[in-house]
Amino acid sequence: MWEDFFMQYSLILCRSLTYAQRAAHTLERAGITSTVRKAPQGASDRGCTYAVKLRSSALARSLHILNEAGIPIGRQFHLMPDGTLQEVGT
C-alpha cells in the first residue's frame, strides 16, 4: 500500500486506443507493467487520445522499447502527487 502511495507514475500519449493497447502489450512482453487509460483533459488538443500509464522509473526504457517496435507515441508526462501533469523535457 505505501509503495503505491509514494510511487511516481508517467503517461505516454498515443493517438488512438489501438496504438495505446499495442504499446501496453509490447511493454508487458518486455516485463514492464502498464495500463491504458483515456488521456486527461489538457494533455492533448485531440479528442480521442489515450495514454499508457507506467512507473516513472521505467519511462526511458519504455520509450526505447516502443521506438524499437515502431509504435508511434506522443508527448510524455509525469503525474505529480497533486494530480497535475508535468510534461517530460520541459
Model-derived segments and their meaning:
Residues 56-90:
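C-terminal structural segments of small proteins and small subunits
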Residues 1-6:
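Short, Lys/Arg-enriched N-terminal segments with co-localized hydrophobic residues
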